Amino acid sequence: AVGPDVSLFKPGDEVFYAGSILRQGTNSEFHLVDERITGNKPKSLSFAQAAALPLTTITAWELLFDRLGAVPGKSVDPRTLLITGGAGGVGSILIQLARRLTGLTVAATATRPESQEWCLDLGAHAVIDHNKPMKEQIEALKVPPVALVASLTFTDQHYKAIAEFMAPQGKFGLIDDPPEFTMSAFKGKAISVHWESMFTRSSFQTADMIAQHNLLNDTADLIDKGVLRTTMDQTFGTINAAHLKRAHALLES
């Protein structure tokens, strides 16, 4: 069903979205969602496969293009993007977007061999271990200057080390809530700091909310063309108390 003022969709359209944190979540069969943060579901994916995409994809897309200012469609970009926690949900989408839509050199961090292999399989040019000195590893790669950083997890543990090898006047983006974060670490190099929160537009009803509708449609098109792929790991089937309990336990692990 659609409301009387809806113009982007009609009854029966298959859609995907991340919703809003200002109302109850999605542990239910029916949802009420603003059309401006809703996209047309990729035709080549099941609903479960599509449902795994909006939260991480909107975050990755906004972080890369809106916050860090990467240029889509630019075939050559003489800079390196470093993604910490590249094997996670956001990182897995971010690697794909950066490799397929920009000319950036993409380096990711991961510790386990299987996580490192996953990052490379998604398209990362190189992977380093964030539990080892990163500056030496970056220098050994001989990649272009690290001008853009997407810090996705444990920012408080790594940002000072990253600031040491970032290029002057670079951009440092993050999505987590570090308990300790000192901006002065970036002052000497005039590095700007950018937080990304994909619920900002819906929470504050920003004038550009429609951007999320557009990027979800662009994502669906890229999925259907085989440029991007879903990162769904597993599905539990029908919505019921037992399955929700299992799913939440997995998320919390």
Describe the residue ranges of each PLM region:
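Short, flexible surface segments
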Residues: 8-11, 77, 168
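Mid-domain Rossmann-like dinucleotide-binding core that forms the NAD(H)/NADP(H) cofactor-binding site
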Residues: 51-132
